[in-house]
Amino acid sequence: MAFDKDAFLTALDSMSVMELNELVKAIEEKFGVSAAAMAAPAAGGGGGAAAAVEEKTEFNVVLLEAGANKVSVIKAVRELTGLGLKEAKDLVDGAPKNVKEAVAKADAEAAVKKLVEAGAKAELK
């Protein structure tokens, strides 16, 4: 049976909140899935001494200041993050802010380089 996606969305649009809740529960039961948001596992607290010796593998890219060429910095932020124009502008206007979080060192260094080339002041943390 072919079911048109647009017809399905129209049917969903006409449902009440209670009906949508029942639909979610039925889908969970039918397919054995959960609609709960996936959470990242918490880090274990047992290896404190070993963790201090290991090299840091995840970095945050922090935009410190937009500089004089704000438009170029906004474009660079959009390329790096995939944010929309308004969101990227808000991020740049609210500096200092994290542009990217928990990324590999090479990716973080490339992101900082791109921001600096656009005229911003950025750093790794």
From Swiss-Prot:
<keyword id="KW-0689">Ribosomal protein</keyword>
<dbReference type="InterPro" id="IPR000206">
    <property type="entry name" value="Ribosomal_bL12"/>
</dbReference>
<dbReference type="GO" id="GO:0006412">
    <property type="term" value="P:translation"/>
</dbReference>
<dbReference type="Pfam" id="PF00542">
    <property type="entry name" value="Ribosomal_L12"/>
</dbReference>
<dbReference type="GO" id="GO:0022625">
    <property type="term" value="C:cytosolic large ribosomal subunit"/>
</dbReference>
<comment type="subunit">
    <text>Homodimer. Part of the ribosomal stalk of the 50S ribosomal subunit. Forms a multimeric L10(L12)X complex, where L10 forms an elongated spine to which 2 to 4 L12 dimers bind in a sequential fashion. Binds GTP-bound translation factors.</text>
</comment>
<dbReference type="GO" id="GO:0003735">
    <property type="term" value="F:structural constituent of ribosome"/>
</dbReference>
<keyword id="KW-0687">Ribonucleoprotein</keyword>
<dbReference type="InterPro" id="IPR014719">
    <property type="entry name" value="Ribosomal_bL12_C/ClpS-like"/>
</dbReference>
<dbReference type="GO" id="GO:0003729">
    <property type="term" value="F:mRNA binding"/>
</dbReference>
<dbReference type="InterPro" id="IPR036235">
    <property type="entry name" value="Ribosomal_bL12_oligo_N_sf"/>
</dbReference>
<protein>
    <recommendedName>
        <fullName>Large ribosomal subunit protein bL12</fullName>
    </recommendedName>
</protein>
<dbReference type="InterPro" id="IPR013823">
    <property type="entry name" value="Ribosomal_bL12_C"/>
</dbReference>
<comment type="function">
    <text>Forms part of the ribosomal stalk which helps the ribosome interact with GTP-bound translation factors. Is thus essential for accurate translation.</text>
</comment>
<dbReference type="Pfam" id="PF16320">
    <property type="entry name" value="Ribosomal_L12_N"/>
</dbReference>
<comment type="similarity">
    <text>Belongs to the bacterial ribosomal protein bL12 family.</text>
</comment>
<dbReference type="InterPro" id="IPR008932">
    <property type="entry name" value="Ribosomal_bL12_oligo"/>
</dbReference>
